[in-house]
Amino acid sequence: MTIKLTPELLEWAYELLNHTEPFDNWNLPDGHEIKFEVTKSAKDCGDYTGYTDGTHRIRISSRCIGTLQKLIEIMAHEMVHLHQATARMETKSQHNAAFYKLAAQVCRIHKFDPKAFA
């Protein structure tokens, strides 16, 4: 049985992670400040977009996510992108050296599969 993704569930997953290391030290926005959307993309399991007006959006695909574990891993991946954006660590390369360093820290703490961050 697969879980049914909703924007509310995405926000709850975000808030859960945001209260754990290392996210709780990253000064990320509260969940209510982020727009969460469920997509049906077969190509992208998730994506983060930061806008010039300071707003944020995280989208997660229901076609890629069937378990709570996978949802949490993909949300954590997008939260690394969010952290890079808010800390001004982004480059033209979506996954730069800083991303992989932060992702390794998240995977080590939460015992996530590093392939979810590739």
Show where each model-derived region lies.
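Walker B catalytic acidic pair
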Residues: E78
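Active-site-proximal or metal-binding-adjacent scaffold patches in catalytic folds
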Residues: M1-E73, L82-A118
